[in-house]
Amino acid sequence: MEKRVQKLILALTMIFLPLFAQDVSQERTVRFSLWASTEIYPGIEKPESDILARPVRKIKEISPFILSGMVYGWKFEYVPYDRARGVQEVFEFSPIQELNEDEISSISYAKPWIEDSILNCWIEFRRSDAQIHIYKGWESVLHPRIKGEGYARLADGFDGIQNACKEALKMAVRNYERKWIKTKPKEISGTVLMSEPPKIGVDAGRYKVTLDFFMQTDRIVEYKTF
């Protein structure tokens, strides 16, 4: 099992380093790469007769979720950890709007290739005029840019990538709050839109997701007393 994970990590590192360096305009056509291993985790997943069925299904599961953050954005609520007040950190997020069936069916899975038991492909989605207007609205207004990294187990598949995205967004919001808000708030809520294609790789046997956002702060609730 350990050798399989090491092999997967090395393969993904070689594949995705050149992809991370690319700078592609996202205004009209959203384009980013996704991958899924053709191998299964014993005791967690059941083998299938078609070795491509599982990775294809995984890629199609995660694509609409990521695209929702690039096309419509995500909303979030963040309660910072406060040891003195006995407040635990809480972070929740959800899509502002999910892709509908027609939009999901218009997603293109382009130029697939297999390398070292990993199925790779480019995800392409053409924005409508209304969606371009949304993107330009975020781009033209002086929204701060934030960035975060998140991690999750490779064996968790779609849930792992979703959890890593959640952590990446939380870290981006947390870093912004610590840098720009002088007094620790009780709660922050707002919305974000991905400003760059997501970077999904591996680090130490885990998914590593790096996300860049435009951010809009909708509400900051302050503590009235200590």
Q: Residue spans of the language-model regions?
A:
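Hydrophobic h-region of N-terminal signal peptides that target proteins for export
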Residues: T13-A21
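Domain-level marker for long, solvent-exposed, non-transmembrane regions
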Residues: F20-F226
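Bacterial N-terminal signal peptides that target proteins for export
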Residues: M1-I9
